[in-house]
């Protein structure tokens, strides 16, 4: 936090990959991180770095805080539903699966213990929940509640978010596609996924590794009035370095897609 403050005071443009300036309410750092922010006045100076949601603000910002990997993957699927007042905002459940690289580059559990797992971690109060709630609440103009439970799975990179929501009103599939297309048709890093059969019926992070894309799809559970919004990304690209470069390009007036418009590394 001190380094960012010092650079900001010198007038430098900053892309921050840490979580230190993602949340705008100082009290949220106590809730989600268990510490008091040393520079609360600077939180309001930071822009949350998702160009698909905040492109114009990022263009003018001096400090952009890149989002958490699971947070950005989930909120890109949920935001159009909140924006169009389609779902119950008190009952949103995010079930996330993430590869081992989501734990960072430091030494950790040995391969023998990590390989082959489907392991829940932080099933309640994961810190990325605060980012999702913050951004969706801003869209809704009211407080949004999100329950998030992440799981470590046996891949190196990739995120799949299964976002369980409950409809406030009846809507058919065609109208849902229209809403998503209206929101993202001009966004080159968002791909809407739905095949009637085969391996590509829904988003799959296997087909995103090495790219800055976020794939979004959905399914309807009419019996339970449930809309399942599905989103996938590469946590090291859209969830980290790719977003940082995309934000830098927007801040600097460069071509937004410079350096990151790569096809996924498939097959791996």
Language model region names:
Residues 47, 66, 97-100, 156, ...:
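Short glycine/serine/threonine-biased micro-segments
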Residues 185, 205-268:
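C-terminal helical cap and adjacent loop that interface with cofactors, partners, or active-site loops
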């Amino acid at each position: 936090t001190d380094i960012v403050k010092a650079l900001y005071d010198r007038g430098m443009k900053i892309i921050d990959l840490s979580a230190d300036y993602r949340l705008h309410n100082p009290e949220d750092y106590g809730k989600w991180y268990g510490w008091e922010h040393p520079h609360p006045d600077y939180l309001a100076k930071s822009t949350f770095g998702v160009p698909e949601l905040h492109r114009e603000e990022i263009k003018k910002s001096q400090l952009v805080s890149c989002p958490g990997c699971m947070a950005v993957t989930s909120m890109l699927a949920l935001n159009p539903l909140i924006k169009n007042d389609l779902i119950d905002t008190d009952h949103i459940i995010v079930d996330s699966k993430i590869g081992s690289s989501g734990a960072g580059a430091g030494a950790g559990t040995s391969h023998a213990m990590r390989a082959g797992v489907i392991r829940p971690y932080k099933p309640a109060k994961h810190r990325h929940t605060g980012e999702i709630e913050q951004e969706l609440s801003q869209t809704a103009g009211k407080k949004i509640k999100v329950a998030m439970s992440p799981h470590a799975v046996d891949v190196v990179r990739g995120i799949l978010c299964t976002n369980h929501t409950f409809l406030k009103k009846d809507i058919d599939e065609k109208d849902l596609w229209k809403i998503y297309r209206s929101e993202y048709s001009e966004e080159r890093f968002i791909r809407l996924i739905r095949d009637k059969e085969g391996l590509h019926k829904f988003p799959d992070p296997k087909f995103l590794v090495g790219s800055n894309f976020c794939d979004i799809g959905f399914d309807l559970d009419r019996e339970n009035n449930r809309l399942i919004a599905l989103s996938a990304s590469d946590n090291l690209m859209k969830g980290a370095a790719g977003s940082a470069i995309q934000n830098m390009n927007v801040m600097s007036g460069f071509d937004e897609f410079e350096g990151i418009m790569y096809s996924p590394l498939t097959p791996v």
